[in-house]
Amino acid sequence: GKYTCGETCFKGKCYTPGCTCSYPICKKD
């Protein structure tokens, strides 16, 4: 996809579309 994951989760959520929290880092769905 056009989005890149890898930001830190914030309260278990990722704000980048298509990403989910794999604590502590957001990973692609």
UniProtKB/Swiss-Prot annotation:
Post-translational modification: This is a cyclic peptide. Contains 3 disulfide bonds.
Protein name as annotated: Cyclotide mela-1
Keywords in alphabetical order: Cytolysis, Disulfide bond, Knottin, Plant defense
Domain of life: Eukaryota
Signal sequence interval, chain numbering: none
Record bears the keyword Repressor: no
Cross-link (Cyclopeptide (Gly-Asp)), chain numbering: G1-D29
